[in-house]
Each structure stands twice: as C-alpha cells, then as structure tokens.
Amino acid sequence: MLQIGRHFSRINKSRVLNTRSFSAALPEREQMHYDVVTVGGGPAGLSAAIKLKQMAIANNIDLSVCVVEKGAELGSHILSGNVFEPRALNELFPDWKDRGAPLETKAGDDQLMWLNESGSSIGIPNMLLPSELHNEGNYIISLSKLVRWLGEQAEELGVEIYPG
C-alpha cells in the first residue's frame, strides 16, 4: 500500500522557496487607455476600427481606437488569395480606387466543371449556377495586401495599431 503521508514528510525543507526573498509584487507596467480595443488586425478588425473612427469623426466625438495584432506586421499571417466582392469596401471607402486599394485584377469568366472518376470533365452552364457563384464585378486579390492597405487607411484616421 502506498504511504502518501510518509512520502511527503521527506521533503527537504531547505529547498522550499524562502518567502522572505520572494516578492509577489509585480513590476509596474505602462498602461494605455483606449475607448475601443480591437483584437485582431485582419479585414474584420480593421474595418470595425475604421468605421468607428469614421463615425466618431463625423459626429465630432473624440474616440481613441486601438488594434492589437498577433503578427509581426499587418497581413503577415494572412497568406490566401481571394475572390473579393467590393460591396463592403464601397461602404467603408467609396473612393477606394482613388486611394489606391490593391484591387487590380477583375474576375474573368465563371466556369464550373464537374470532374468524374475517369478524369474527364463536364462544363456546367452558367445559367444553372446560383448567383453566389457569379463573380461579375469581383476582384482577384492578395488578402495580405488588402489588410496592409486597410491598416494604412486606419492609421490615417488616427487608429493606433500594435503588431507583434
């Protein structure tokens, strides 16, 4: 039978942390106060921060907004390409083309192919595709470039961004 009490009675008390030499007090840290902190510098977090600042500016409200991003820089961990529908960007920045948004390549023809087991394919007519699969007016983009651009726009509005 295991004798737990006897096992613990053998602890070398000289190895136990000396409480007089240990201070539980943490060093004082710098504090920064913001009205809004957005966690995540992806498209959604940056868009939220931008919209809040735009609304505050339009209503003459002093609102401090901060974005905290885990990556070393904005867009550093967003590696995907994207078929981007610019409707939300039109609402955020109606003049996004003049501002140099990195939306350069318009989506071309839509084609949906059914691949069968023998390796051949059959094209499905576009008229049979749901509207969500039509890419007219959309762009082929690097999401990382768009995020970096959104970060620049946010900083111009006064959003503070802390990567890393």
Predicted regions and their residues:
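N-terminal Rossmann-like FAD-binding beta1-loop-alpha1 element of flavoenzymes
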Residues: 33-66
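Short beta-strand to alpha-helix junction loop
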Residues: 132-156, 162
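N-terminal FAD cofactor-binding segment of flavoenzymes
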Residues: 62-119
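N-terminal mitochondrial targeting presequence
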Residues: 1-32
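Generic structural signal for well-ordered, non-membrane alpha-helical segments
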Residues: 45, 82-85, 105, 139, ...
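Secondary-structure transition into beta-strands, especially the periplasmic turns and strand N-termini
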Residues: 56, 158-159
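Low-complexity, highly charged intrinsically disordered N-terminal segments
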Residues: 123-127
